[in-house]
Amino acid sequence: MRRLYQTVCTLALLLVGLQAAHADDIIDVIGGQEGAMPVAVIPFAVTGEIPTPDQDIARVISDNLARSGRFEVLPREELVARPAGLDDTRFSAWRALGMDYLVTGRMEMDGHRVSVTFELLDVFRGNRIEGRRYRLHPDNLRSLAHAISDIVFEEVVGLPGVFGTQIAYVQVEERNDQRIHRLMVADADGQRPREILESRQPIMSPAWSPERDRLAYVSFEGGRSEIYVQNLRSGQRDRIASFRGINSAPAWSPDGRHLAVTLSRDGRANIYLLRLDDGHVRRLTDHWAIDTEPTFSPDGERIAFTSDRGGRPQVYTLAVNGPGGVERVTFDGDYNARPNWSPDGRRIAMVHRHNGSFRIAVHDLESDRTRVLTDGPWDESPVFAPNGDMIMYSAGGSGDSRLRTVSVHGRANQALPRAGGLTREPAW
């Protein structure tokens, strides 16, 4: 349970439960594929030998689409045929299976490069929605699979795909009776992980810059919490907050010029705005309670954060500039924490204690209703995908923590692969 509020470490023990205030406004939407669009992803026809283990890009595309919750992918063993494009597709057979879409393609070696053609077909109309051709190095086939997945997703759903994006997270392993913490970056499906930083002291709260070229995070390498910003291209890392007491929970402003952070330099944990070009800090909250875990609204005008000023942890908002005081957002349940604002500004994801379990929920700011998306019992650290259509979080608690994704409609929930140890604190 300690990690459910680990951005303030042992202060988490102060944040315990309260009786639910508006239980009728809590909706469970866990599991099921109702409303998902049926699609068949055909293994790409291959001419010649492709010198890479990533040649089955259809499998990557299938996994991506299924994980989104927007598609119900036909199992490969149920395919009635394996067309390579529009010209050799018998649409009547796929209509009989109830398919809405087909994804087909071909691959062949062209010198030292691979020529790849893919088509997205509309089964009902019997036509081609999209078709493209690529020529690339075999090592880039997995990236191409993510790009094709993004195209299919956007053509069908109307939202940008996120399969070609990257995630950051913290991996924890035991080595020679010591706990090793690693800051990692990987593809959105958890594949191709690479290490950014290793430490024998805790690393927490990674956060992407808006340009996605820098990570802010908390490190205890100096014996206490400090906030760093690291450039992923150059590797340069700068310590930007090392005040007395707690330095935690960095969150980027949409313009990339500021970080909202939690500091206790004045004796209490409050939210501050830190200007990156000169290090100037401005206090945004001034309360005896614990104020922590800030997250910006997409327009940068407001910040949501966790506070126990009402007696138990709940989500509040405040205006970054100008008039407007602190407003309480959540009243459903006895514990709501770790808010993350959706890219469209309409929802806040959070950790919600429901029926004794810590679960991921989404609070709709317009309807003021809370939807529970996961089963728990130890789910934490939710973060929206860049398109707002999925949420990544850490499940399993401190003993067996791993990353999972859940669609915002609750249709799909899948675990990401892990090479070893525990995976937690995702940033997307």
From Swiss-Prot:
BP-aspect Gene Ontology terms: cell division; protein import
Q: Which HAMAP family match?
A: TolB
Q: According to the UniProt record, which cysteines are disulfide-bonded?
A: none
Q: What is this protein called?
A: Tol-Pal system protein TolB
Q: How does it assemble?
A: The Tol-Pal system is composed of five core proteins: the inner membrane proteins TolA, TolQ and TolR, the periplasmic protein TolB and the outer membrane protein Pal. They form a network linking the inner and outer membranes and the peptidoglycan layer.
Function text: Part of the Tol-Pal system, which plays a role in outer membrane invagination during cell division and is important for maintaining outer membrane integrity.
Which InterPro entries did the record assign?
Answer: 6-blade_b-propeller_TolB-like, PD40, Tol-Pal_TolB, TolB_N
Report the SUPFAM superfamilies cross-referenced here. TolB, N-terminal domain, Tricorn protease N-terminal domain
The record's keywords, sorted A to Z, are:
Cell cycle, Cell division, Periplasm, Signal
Query: What Gene Ontology terms describe where this protein resides (cellular component)?
Result: periplasmic space
**Does this entry carry the keyword Transcription regulation?**
no
Where in or outside the cell? Periplasm
**Where is the signal peptide, in residue numbers?**
1-23
PANTHER family assigned to the protein according to its UniProt record, in alphabetical order: PROTEIN TOLB (PTHR36842:SF1), PROTEIN TOLB HOMOLOG (PTHR36842)
The Swiss-Prot or TrEMBL record describes its family as follows: Belongs to the TolB family.
> Which organism is this protein's natural source?
Alkalilimnicola ehrlichii (strain ATCC BAA-1101 / DSM 17681 / MLHE-1)
